[in-house]
Amino acid sequence: MKTVKQVLENKGYQTHSVAPGATVYEALQKMAREGIGALAVLEGEELVGIVSERDYARKVILTGRDSRETLVRDIMTENVICVSSELRVDATMSIMTEKCVRHLVIRDDEKINGLISIGDVVKAIIDDQQFTIEQLEHYISGHG
């Protein structure tokens, strides 16, 4: 089973972030531009939260707020769940399922190495299972 590090090597180590004082609208523009669903919220180098499309839907749209006037700090999730890049992908999926989150911050030795989404995790698991199936088919057909 792949590790988070292997997923990041394929995906890239870029950490997309936003400042807590940015507007939600600015954060949404960045997410749309990058094709992602969440941003790390950094105050300087310090991780202070995570903001996602889900935060926007629940804390801005459903409450009638204006994304151009609401600040990221007002809707971000402060208790960020971080995992090591050495964690296996299946363990990562278990954490996401247990905690009901779709994004995790990857942090090693206090350094943020990226974000991983449930989509990244599912793709890695499917790729791993496909490889296993191909190996079994090869073995069964007598070529192994």
What residue ranges belong to the model's regions?
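Short, flexible active-site loop motifs that bind/organize anionic cofactors or intermediates
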Residues: Q14-S17, E46-L47, L62, C82, ...
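A glycine-centered beta-loop-beta connector
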Residues: M31-E34, L39-D55, M96, L104-G119
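Short, charge-rich amphipathic segments
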Residues: A22-R33, G64-I75, E110-K111
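Tandem CBS (Bateman) regulatory domains
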Residues: M1-Y13, S52-I81, R88-T97, S117-G144
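The conserved cystathionine-beta-synthase
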Residues: S17-G35, C82-C100, R107
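A positional/architectural concept
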Residues: T3-V48
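Charged, low-complexity, helix/coiled-coil-prone segments
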Residues: M1-T3, M31-L42, D74-S84, D108
